[in-house]
Amino acid sequence: MAPPAPPPACPLCAAPGAHVLHQSARRRWWLCGGPCGLVYVDPAQRPDAAAERAQYDLHRNDPADAGYVRFLGRLVEPLLAALGPAPRQGLDFGCGPGPTLSGLLAAAGHAVADYDPIYRPDVALLARRYDFVTATEVVEHFHEPAREFARLRGLLRPGGLLALMTKRRAQPERFAGWHYKNDPTHVSFYHTDPLGWIAAGWGATLTLPAPDVALLRLPDSPPAD
């Protein structure tokens, strides 16, 4: 009999030694055995691009949806306070089919471009740098969070701000009943440890102004070698 395959390395910090946090009939969720504490779906059980697109096409988030606008307000208010005087230049990364956040920030005097790998795939926007980048309900979809967070880091100017919105992962004893894990496109789950690990690696400061909002601010100048 062949020996069991080793646990998949953490897709954020690359640590080995993960253990199964929860398992259902269709999915297995691993808890990182290293320093970052990410929870992630088994790579073999992630949805493919077509399945992801089919799920995203079901979303009906747009500027005319008052409930969605209120939802985004949980990020908009602390972000505007952190940005200071307008205008600042920003990018909404993963804006979806109905960009909304950029309009809310534009109303406060900021210039925000919309990028989405499916619905607005203008890769020229990824060659620029910004005062701030937003990613609302995005990072939980990352199959390769190390690569994607490096991309987000590279979009920011010195002193820039990354504003994230994602539900923070339930405690292990409550994970089995946590609804957020059930979306088939949600494959990476964060709480304060993974977010703190990312911030430390960037030399950034981390603030958590709401239960599902995180702000990471880069230093004003790159750290010396």
Predicted regions, residues:
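Conserved N-terminal segment of class I S-adenosyl-L-methionine
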Residues: 1-132, 136, 147-150, 165, ...
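Short conserved AdoMet
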Residues: 84, 143, 157
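Residue-level detector of anion-binding/catalytic polar loops
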Residues: 111, 161, 205
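A short His-aromatic
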Residues: 137, 141
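A short glycine-rich, Lys/Arg-flanked "PGG" loop and its adjoining helix->strand segment in the class I
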Residues: 149-158
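Short, glycine-/aromatic-enriched active-site segment of Class I SAM-dependent methyltransferases
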Residues: 165-188, 193-194
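Low-complexity, intrinsically disordered Gly/Pro/Thr-rich segments
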Residues: 192-204
